[in-house]
Amino acid sequence: MSLLYLTFLFPLLGWLVLAFSLGRFGERTSALIGVGSIGLSALTTLWVGIDFLGNPPEGGVYVQRLWQWMAVGNFTPSFSLALDGLSLTMLGVVTGVGFFIHLFASWYMRGEEGYSRFFTYTNLFIASMLFLVLADDLLFVYLGWEGVGLCSYLLIGFYYKDRKNGAAALKAFVVTRVGDVFLAIGLFILYRELGTLNIHELLVRAPTLFAEGSPALSLACLMLLGGAVGKSAQLPLQTWLADAMAGPTPVSALIHAATMVTAGVYLIARTHGLFLLAPEILHLVGLVGAITLVLAGFAALVQTDIKRILAYSTMSQIGYMFLALGVGAWEGAIFHLMTHAFFKALLFLSAGAVIVACHHEQNIFKMGGLRKSLPLVYACFLVGGSALAALPLVTSGFYSKDAILWQVEASGQSALLWAGLVGAFLTSLYTFRLIFIAFHGKEQTKAHAGHGLAHHLPLLVLLVLSTGIGALITPPLAGVLPAGPGDHIEEGRHALEITSGIIAIAGIVLAAFLFLGERRLATSIANSAPGRLLSTLWFNAWGFDWLYDQLWVKPYLLATRLVGQDPLDWMMGLPAWFALRGNQLLAWTVTGKLRWYAASMGIGAVLVLALLLLG
């Protein structure tokens, strides 16, 4: 376990080497460094994990103190790494899934301008995420938090020559910064009240210093939730995620499966002891997840861009994790985080293969019949889509989503359970809508299948992990997180499993009925007046972008224009204005005509005499 620091040091070194090369390396060298550094990190994680599970440290936590960062009064943050079952699970997801995404990216990005720059950014992305999950102090968690935010901005705007991509990157950066401000305020409150930001010390001190429902702690947890919803794209800071599809497809896989959007879930799970003392805020976590998963499900139903459909599905699945956290199903949330990483990475990488095969076409209605020309990718979409839809017994997604739904039912919160079941139906419907439209029906474009180890291996490994085999990998969370409300109850569980399975299959059957064949019924529904209204509303993600534009963007721009007109500048400019106007008046009197001058002299003489007489 003493090699723990190498897990994030390898990606950090990869970033430094690629950054200082200034793009001089060729594609082969850049890929070797970029992919190799993540591979070494994954191997180190495997070694550390075997050692940790075989020789558990005392107390279940191994702390590696590297150095003290600063000492200002009582504020003495130490640069330390903490390894327990939760951070080990996150390490495995980030490095394991991240490695296969990098390997696939080495194929996907071939021939692209900025090949070396791409791996420079992704290595820093992985290093920042690893720093986030290993830090034993919320201050260092925040540094990693900001690191993944910066890297997401760089990667979403990777094709920066297109102004739309730059705007999407800026939008993601600004919206997530709103959440980051809330998180920073939460850290300030915690340090003021508890005198430390060390996670272990926080969880020990909070129960002794705060009563349940304490206003100060509730406010701190609310601020932490604000940071989590921003980074994990939950209501009301969810608007950036769909636009983040502007980046290369492997970036989407990294953000959605292995790194950024899972950070909010990790933060709440890591600080669970604080949220347990603020039950109203914990309930709000579940409510946010329930609303988000339903709204995102409807939005995904009408999208035409293959990546945006998957983006809204991520928003919905993260909603399930928040739902689990909100009812105290801590292990269920992390289990679903892990399985979701498997099948969502598979789906995004498969989508990338489809996009390349179809000459960078992303509209599913311009595809069709791809199952014949892309049999491997079709199989990956079937397995990954089935896991996303939680097809019973054979997929990893079924076991993790069922664990969440059971804990929600055991908690007695029926409204949240209904939201989860509605979301399950919508998920299977929009997932197989995508599959049936893109891979069945009439062929719309001539596709060419990808080839090579870097293309096939990641897809095949993730395909296997998306089946029920992936569910056999259980996160080592015993003793790290509290038991959920349904951990010791079995009565009624099988009935819920059957119900959720029927719902998933019903969604697939309805998708087949609507989108296989001529699709006349689906077309007639879409062209009806209610259909057009709802599809417009859902396509625009319930109008949140428009609403925020009216509430925040336009008033802000108006305020900048008003502030730009500085009254002091205006007053200081008055003498110059009068001088200019006087000069213009005098210039107007210069006509060059003798009669005008004589008349002017006469008028002037009369005015002088009048003044003398009046005086």
Q: Each predicted region: which residue ranges?
A:
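Hydrophobic alpha-helical membrane-embedded segments
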Residues: 46, 344, 425-432, 504-525
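Hydrophobic transmembrane alpha-helices and their helix-loop junctions in integral membrane proteins
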Residues: 86, 96, 100-141, 150-451, ...
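Aromatic-capped, Gly/Pro-kinked transmembrane alpha-helices
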Residues: 74, 480-495, 517-615
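Membrane-entry segments of alpha-helical transmembrane domains in multi-pass membrane proteins
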Residues: 1-9, 25-32, 75-93, 131-144, ...
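Transmembrane helix-loop-helix hairpins at membrane boundaries of multipass inner-membrane proteins
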Residues: 2-5, 21-120, 192-214, 239, ...
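Hydrophobic alpha-helical membrane-insertion segments
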Residues: 36-54, 179-189, 382-389, 458-475, ...
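Hard-cation-handling environments
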Residues: 448-510
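N-terminal signal-anchor/start-transfer transmembrane helix
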Residues: 8-23, 99-100, 229, 293
